[in-house]
Amino acid sequence: MLKEHPEMAEAPQQQLGIPVVKLEKELPWGRGREDPSPETFRLRFRQFRYQEAAGPQEALRELQELCRRWLRPELHTKEQILELLVLEQFLTILPREFYAWIREHGPESGKALAAMVEDLTERALEAKAVPCHRQGEQEETALCRGAWEPGIQLGPVEVKPEWGMPPGEGVQGPDPGTEEQLSQDPGDETRAFQEQALPVLQAGPGLPAVNPRDQEMAAGFFTAGSQGLGPFKDMALAFPEEEWRHVTPAQIDCFGEYVEPQDCRVSPGGGSKEKEAKPPQEDLKGALVALTSERFGEASLQGPGLGRVCEQEPGGPAGSAPGLPPPQHGAIPLPDEVKTHSSFWKPFQCPECGKGFSRSSNLVRHQRTHEEKSYGCVECGKGFTLREYLMKHQRTHLGKRPYVCSECWKTFSQRHHLEVHQRSHTGEKPYKCGDCWKSFSRRQHLQVHRRTHTGEKPYTCECGKSFSRNANLAVHRRAHTGEKPYGCQVCGKRFSKGERLVRHQRIHTGEKPYHCPACGRSFNQRSILNRHQKTQHRQEPLVQ
């Protein structure tokens, strides 16, 4: 049977005066309900899946359209688009505890964002988290003098957790509709998770309603789950059974995992009923943990008995994290500046210099700097403590200079050398002397300058003469060895100092840069000009 063509079917209807309504198919990412916000298109661009398109060409067109609506090249320059992409990646790699501060303060540029993160890091390193005393002990600390109160405001958090639900309400696990939604594909699962989790934050029994700004932040964390913000098991949150009685089923879906009672220390009288509420996606757990840890802290922003750190019982199952403090019978709210994250906890200290590290591998890598230089260059024999230092040095022999200055197009083999060179264009001199307030573009120049105030001369020759700079000592030693490394390419005459070669070359070039202000005569050396002024123009001041 022949099928009628759509255009042929529409013609009689139009002739009869019947209005024809064309229904456009809604795109997979919901363009029918288009939101003009660039953030919406960014999320759609990051979450777009190949299965949502009819084919590779359609998928490519959809990605191009989403990217264009996100970055808006018709409104932004290339530099602005580049900065936007760099900022997005920088925010992705930042620790989770910075998210609330960034969203609250809203830095205007990448430099302002980096300065804010650096300031928060320094403040967090200065603050120390003091654990509360165990139950039964009488000693107290400065931060443990007051009892925990649910109404205390913690940092920038406006939501105040209240753990006052009746103990009779138990957790029955997720409803069948939740399980059916979680069994769908990853994209539908993410959307279903957001639809269930966001109402929990809006009007949950344990949490008051939050403002729209916090809801937007929550949505950003939920949709960022696929980027791997960290698994739930890596966090120091452990909910005993007695605390799960006070959590709603929707909140269990959010937290995503039930902790066995035997894995943690619980108060006497706790039941042993096991609750099964484990959504399969680890990224959804990590997304919510990123939100809750940022909003309420990780291990210290809890009510009485909530979030106790797991500890292996004698003869119990292995797997407890080494180095964690013993379980406490209370947790205290910390100041705003304190962020209990592993990036601020540095338990591994170098026995040589006392520098702290958050990972043992970083400590081992640092300790190599105190050992012998085991990596040697086959070209010049220079030794290095780390392999990456040797690889950077080998660029000087291979002629690789990948870093280019955008102002003068000068190339460098290392990024640090380029950054120092760019200060000559910007005039930046970040290193200042505390005695005379003179500024320098390099730290080494400041160190050499400060020796003029202290009188320090650490470089000593065999003859007993001392110098404040190593370069001056090297030039002085040539007087003993007779070395003359600087040679004239015209006449072959050699010199021990570079400035003497420069003065000599003026004889061949005829250059006379020193002029007498009285008579206008020119000379190729400053000493000759001074002698001329003494004999011919005694009244005139000498040229310095």
UniProtKB/Swiss-Prot annotation:
GO BP, one annotated term: regulation of transcription by RNA polymerase II
Xref: SMART domains: SCAN, ZnF_C2H2
Glycyl lysine isopeptide (Lys-Gly) (interchain with G-Cter in SUMO2) cross-link, renumbered residues: 3, 22, 128, 278, 285
Chief location of this protein within or outside the cell: nucleus
A GO cellular component entry from the record: nucleus
Disulfide bonds: none
UniProt keyword Oxidoreductase, yes or no: no
PROSITE patterns found in the cross-reference section: SCAN_BOX, ZINC_FINGER_C2H2_1, ZINC_FINGER_C2H2_2
Residue span of region Disordered: 157-189
C2H2-type Zn finger ranges: 348-370, 375-397, 403-425, 431-453, 459-480, 486-508, 514-536
Protein name as catalogued: Zinc finger and SCAN domain-containing protein 25
Organism: Homo sapiens (Human)
Gene expressing this chain: ZSCAN25
